[in-house]
């Protein structure tokens, strides 16, 4: 998942979107 789509991608998992080296990382809230 790209950084651009990260917020939407993570919100479905109720997680926080973070960008690491242009990769999407979801952090549990």
Swiss-Prot record:
Pfam families with a match to the protein in the record: Toxin_6 (PF05453)
InterPro entries: Scorpion_toxin-like_sf, Toxin_alpha-KTx_8/9
GO cellular component, one term: extracellular region
Cellular compartment(s): Secreted
UniProt keyword Lipid biosynthesis present: no
This protein's UniProt keywords: Chloride channel impairing toxin, Disulfide bond, Ion channel impairing toxin, Secreted, Toxin, Voltage-gated chloride channel impairing toxin
This protein's record includes keyword Magnesium: no
Entry comment describing in which tissues the protein is expressed: Expressed by the venom gland.
Cysteine disulfide links: 3-19, 6-24, 10-26
Recorded GO MF terms: chloride channel regulator activity; ion channel inhibitor activity; toxin activity
Notes on the domains: Has the structural arrangement of an alpha-helix connected to a beta-sheet by disulfide bonds (CSalpha/beta).
Other comment: Negative results: does not inhibit ClC-0, ClC-1/CLCN1, ClC-3/CLCN3, ClC-4/CLCN4, CFTR chloride channel, GABRR, calcium-activated chloride channel regulator (Cl(Ca)), Shaker, and Kv1.2/KCNA2.
Family: Belongs to the short scorpion toxin superfamily. Potassium channel inhibitor family. Alpha-KTx 08 subfamily.
Annotated protein name in UniProt: Potassium channel toxin alpha-KTx 8.3
Organism for this UniProt entry: Leiurus hebraeus
């Amino acid at each position: 998942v790209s950084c651009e789509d990260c917020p939407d991608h993570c919100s479905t998992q109720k997680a926080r979107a973070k960008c690491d080296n242009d990769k999407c990382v979801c952090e549990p809230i």
